[in-house]
Amino acid sequence: MIFLILTMAMGIFSAETAHTINRNAEDKIQYVNGADVIVAEDWAERAFGTAGVDDAEIVFTEPDFTKYHDMDEDALMTKVLYRGNVGIAGASSIKSSLLGINTKEFGEVANMKDGLLSEHWYHYLNAMSQDPEGVLVSTSFRDELGYKLGDRISFRENNSDTIRGVIYGFVDYWPGMTPPEAGEDGTSYFIIANLSLVQMKWGVQPYEVWMKNLGDSSQYIYDFAEKYEISFQKFVDTNADLIDLKNDPVFQGTNGVLTVGFIVVLVLCSVGFLIYWILSIQSRALQFGIFRAMGMTMREVLSMLFNEQLFISGVSIAAGVGVGKLASKLFVPMIQMAYSSAEQIIPLEIQTAANDTMKLYIVVGVVMIVCMVILGWMIKKIKIAQALKLGED
């Protein structure tokens, strides 16, 4: 029983540990990137004003956006304005990130893991869409600066016009934004505003184009760049990042250690299980001889042995699954201790590998069948007459 309990427990623990590491690493990449594909072109700019004056107005020339419609059959897309150094009125020492979005398009394109917010993030987008001045801010504005729902917040970048918004919600997480707990000092300031509001105050500013793949591949963006001979200032391909993750030596090594560890335990436990039953059958040769002398057929003897195995092994497998689940619940969360808060980004979530667990059951089942075949063959090889004579002596 101990052999089977150890095998099942180690298998469950290894499967859930590997699946948790893999899935959370993928979720982190998708969250940090924000979308399947992100590109930004170089914008031509000209300064207007008196020479040598710092506050000269800068006018940007927007690249032709209509060419992106060539990819309408391959991806959904939206314009996203990102600024990383926005000042907050009344808090001169605070610098915030700003994300200007079109709420409907952003909801269709961005990647956001379920369960990170108290409500589905679509509810926050719906709230923003009701008011052009509606903004969402990180919880650091509430916890550190005392802002409340419905308060007005003013922000600006360098010498640009001040934008005033109304706070419609506080969020810890948002696609592409660093959450407060991942900040260097436990705080992170970011503002999510309507792109129309930002452009009305600041004019047309360089923006990024976020895309969501309609298929499994992102090859279309490479074909697009080659067709128009574009060298992007910023280029993010989440699919490529996920492939790089899976090819990472440390990542592969971790998965390899877990897999090899389970295989070694499976082999050792299977050999131990088989040795135990071989010795058990050899010591019960007289008992099997008596059963045959009582009129039991070989089929009935094998059926009895099968039922014995079924009940003993069934209890062991159930106990092993319970021990494995308990060990996963207690020790898998300790994985996050290996990462600093800045690397963690989003909370670690224990993942149950249903497919891997089913494979484990199949492997253990095959091992059990092989062992039963070997044991059945050994029982048939027992010389019943010799066993009975041994009993008479």
Language model features: what each stretch is:
Residues D36-D42, F141-R142, Q199-K234:
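A short beta-strand structural signal in non-transmembrane regions
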Residues L6-D36, I278, A327, F331-Q336:
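Alpha-helical transmembrane segments
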